[in-house]
Curated annotation (Swiss-Prot):
It comes from Shewanella baltica (strain OS155 / ATCC BAA-1091). The gene is pyrC. The lineage of its organism: Bacteria, Pseudomonadati, Pseudomonadota, Gammaproteobacteria, Alteromonadales. The modification N6-carboxylysine is found at residue 99. Catalyzes the reversible cyclization of carbamoyl aspartate to dihydroorotate. Belongs to the metallo-dependent hydrolases superfamily. DHOase family. Class II DHOase subfamily. This is Dihydroorotase.
């Protein structure tokens, strides 16, 4: 039986939701992740320090007994985010980053940024105090094809931010294209990226060929196979610029299986197991630990986790659904096998 032991991993991008759903999402991700960067796109969003810290308390209240899981909080940037709010958030010790959602780009992003210049004072403060800048890298112009929105964002927006704020640490989140891989690789050491398990394992054929599979529908959308291969190569390259971020984003079953379904794929039930499959597919299990456990904390200037987990190559069948508050979520690989499990 094949086993691998790695330093306990972290998730550098997750959606835990709120209310009744929180106990289920926290239960799933805290099983083996030491920390997680928690997205602030709630309703209403966590646009100030106080809101983010009360959300932190709600998450901590759901952490199972015996778990050392620690949520790392994020401020939701708006056109009105002030430099003082950035300094206050940084001083809290619990808010480690602020997030750019272009208005309308993804779930609960309606309060997001409408003009880049509106957040320049906040970005200057972030650069000054050492707060990380997390980016959902898609334009929202309806005339731009949905498969091109990441590339156009990089060309027209991100390249300018990187040039204007050379000392700002930036994470381009959930990258999905070779264009993003190339940009991050060629940028300074202050630019990094997270990659999801589902973008490593799947491409748009899995979502669209032979019938529409709504549980693969996420934003940024799955791209063609050539982009998937570029992501796999980047993750397995050993580069310190790429690290684990699940972007696990639960929606109720009826919100996904609908005439106008929500964007988001749920992977918190088996995140590291799915990443192990992806790395094994390119004969790179020896690179998994750095990607999952080292590169993220190193980029955030946080200590690596001190303990370990052991993965065993032993297939198990994923349930058709998991509980999600007063409803259910259909996870990635529902009703099918995953090759790895945590011992």
């Amino acid at each position: 039986m094949t086993t691998i032991t790695i330093t306990r991993p972290d998730d550098w991008h997750i959606h835990l939701r709120d209310g009744a759903q929180l106990k289920d999402t926290v239960r799933d991700i805290s099983r083996y992740m030491g920390r997680a960067i928690v997205m602030p796109n709630l309703v209403p969003p966590a646009i100030d320090t106080e809101t983010a810290l009360t959300y932190y308390d709600r998450i901590k209240a759901q952490v199972p007994a015996g778990s050392q899981f620690e949520p790392l909080m994020v401020l939701y940037l708006t056109d009105k985010t002030s430099p003082d709010e950035i300094r206050k958030a940084k001083a809290s010790g619990k808010i480690v980053a602020a997030k750019l959602y272009p208005a309308g780009a993804t779930t609960n992003s309606d309060s997001g940024v409408t003009e880049l210049k509106n957040i320049y004072p906040a970005l200057e403060a972030m650069q000054e105090v050492g707060m990380l800048f997390l980016v959902h890298g898609e334009v929202t112009d309806s005339s731009i094809d949905i498969f091109d929105r990441e590339r156009v964002f990089i060309e027209n927006i991100l390249s300018k931010i990187v040039a204007d704020f050379p000392e700002l640490k930036i994470v381009l989140e959930h990258i999905t294209t070779k264009d993003a891989v190339d940009f991050v690789t060629q940028a300074s050491d202050n630019v990094a990226a997270t990659i999801t398990a589902h973008h490593l394992l799947y491409n748009r054929n899995h979502m669209l060929a032979g019938g529409i599979r709504p549980h693969f529908y996420c934003l940024p959308i799955l791209k063609r196979n050539t982009h998937q291969q570029a992501l796999l190569a980047a993750a397995a390259s050993g580069s310190k610029k790429f690290f684990l971020g699940t972007d696990s984003a639960p929606h109720a079953k009826d919100k996904k299986e609908a005439a106008c379904g929500c964007a988001g794929s749920y992977t918190a039930h088996a995140a590291i197991e799915l990443y192990a499959e992806a790395f094994e597919s390119v004969n790179a299990l020896d690179k998994l630990e750095a990607f999952a456990s080292f590169n993220g904390p190193d980029f955030y200037n946080l200590p690596r986790n001190a303990d370990t987990i052991t993965l065993v190559k032993k297939p198990w069948n994923v349930p058709a659904t998991y509980p999600l508050g007063d409803t259910n979520v259909v996870p990635i690989r529902a009703g099918e096998a995953i090759d790895w499990q945590v011992e």
